[in-house]
């Protein structure tokens, strides 16, 4: 077998590590244009792992009726935010900029946590009214509802020349296997319709 060292990073930092050759493969939940811009001057191969819904974690019953990002500008809504470079943070910041909403007007915006599990826990423990993230964290909590907003892709990103190497070619074969799809389908919120699709950037 081939030894694999894994490091948990957000999408931005994963691509940064790939660009500076500190990693051979990055896992990123950004669109293809973002990936291209963050790793310039490099031929890339991008494999779709799965698609998932990003949405709100809310207490059971959604007592404050949070159904859209516009709700975050309300003074009675406090958010548990993610760190810069994470997909939920990028998603939120783009919305705020596009809607001309000042981050300073969003209660809790400066509270940065480093995982979906931690933001979901903040909502479950009544330290925040809501947070953005993947459905699985709400499901694991058992105390939260999930309000989906949009479907996003999760990609594996590598330099194109790596695909000619046995370990990387084997990885693509695994991702395209029925066994891998079956495992993903057993996880909450993962859509395998596009699993195994390969893109060249």
Stretch-by-stretch model annotation:
Residues 48-55, 144-173, 192-199:
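Periplasmic-binding protein-like
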Residues 7-16, 104-121:
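Short helix-initiation/N-cap motifs at beta->coil->alpha
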Residues 60-67, 101, 161-166:
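Short helix-loop capping/hinge motifs at secondary-structure junctions, enriched
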């Amino acid at each position: 077998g081939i030894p694999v060292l894994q490091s948990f990073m957000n999408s931005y930092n994963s691509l940064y590590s790939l660009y500076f050759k500190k990693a051979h493969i990055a896992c990123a939940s950004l669109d293809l244009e973002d990936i291209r811009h963050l790793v310039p001057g490099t031929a890339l191969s991008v494999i779709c792992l799965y698609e998932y819904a990003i949405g709100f974690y809310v207490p059971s019953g959604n007592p404050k009726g949070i159904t859209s990002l516009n709700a975050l500008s309300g003074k009675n809504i406090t958010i548990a935010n993610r760190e810069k470079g994470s997909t939920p943070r990028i998603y939120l910041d783009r919305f705020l900029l596009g809607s001309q909403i000042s981050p300073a007007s969003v209660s809790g915006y400066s509270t940065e946590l480093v995982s979906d599990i931690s933001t979901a826990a903040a909502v479950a423990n009544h330290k925040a009214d809501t947070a953005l993230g993947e459905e699985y964290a709400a499901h694991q909590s058992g105390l939260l509802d999930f309000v989906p907003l949009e479907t996003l892709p999760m990609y594996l990103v590598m330099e194109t020349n790596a695909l000619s190497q046995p370990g990387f070619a084997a990885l693509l074969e695994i991702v395209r296997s029925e066994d891998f799809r079956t495992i993903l389908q057993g996880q909450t919120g993962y859509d395998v319709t596009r699993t195994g699709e390969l893109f060249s950037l």
